[in-house]
Amino acid sequence: YMDFEMNMNNTKNKREGFKADLIAIGAIKYDTKTKKIEKFKSLIKPILTKTVYPHIEELTHITTEDLENAPTYESVMRSFKHWLGDFNEIDGIYTFGNLDLTCFKNTDRISSQKNNHPRFLNNIQNFFVDIKEKYLEYGVKCMNYISLTHLLELSNMKFSGDAHDPLYDAYNLHILDEILEKNQDVRNYLIIQDINKSPYNQIDDEIEAKIKDYEKYLYHKEGNYNIDDLSIDILSIVGRY
């Protein structure tokens, strides 16, 4: 499970957004047999923009001064690939969305051309799995518009550590994947979140409260509003729609 922190302009222009610099990496390696977790974290000296944008510093608490003595992208990637170990034992490298991989590709290309080193992505690109895409295939559409922190809350878990710390982000992504992989009830509850928005919540303005009542029943066994009751109400909304 891997996460990058990026230094990018606060712009709505998607092309400009893809010019982001990688400034930190966090990853955890989870052994499915032993349940052992290993950690990797490093700052990364930026290639394009040496100054950290104010909104990025506020989010990540990474300063321009922090990055002045940070290891280069090439150095960090050599350490990271060594830390990954035997590629034959890797089931996947999991990210939350495709922006991390997009910026990784761009930085890898620029650094390779500028510093004449091999493309580090060449041997690992096929291992990448977008967690959002994985659970969209289950019908969990809210993965596209709900944050990792909120997804954990809806899964009856709290985010561990500081958000926008790449190591904590990677660890919490692992926790979310573990929960959703093993617990169909939680997946179904996340699928239900899609009914709690327009136009459905305009047809039944009590649907949010009903979903919360079911959450109490699901996670805390409070009340008696169960999945059958909620399903009937949802079918009624869809029928009226």
Give, region by region, the residue ranges found by the protein language model.
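Entry/capping segment at the start of metal-dependent catalytic domains
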Residues: Y1-T34
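A generic structural signal for short coil/turn motifs at secondary-structure boundaries
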Residues: T11-N13, L67, E137
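Metal-dependent phosphoesterase core characteristic of DEDDh/y 3'-5' exonuclease domains
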Residues: A20-L22, K29-T60, F87-K216
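Metal-dependent phosphoesterase signature
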Residues: E58-M77
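A short glycine-/small-residue-rich loop at the edge of a beta-strand within enzyme catalytic domains
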Residues: P71, T95, G139, K221, ...
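Short, basic/hydrophobic alpha-helical segments
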Residues: M77-N88
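C-terminal accessory domains and tails appended to enzymatic cores
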Residues: K210-Y241
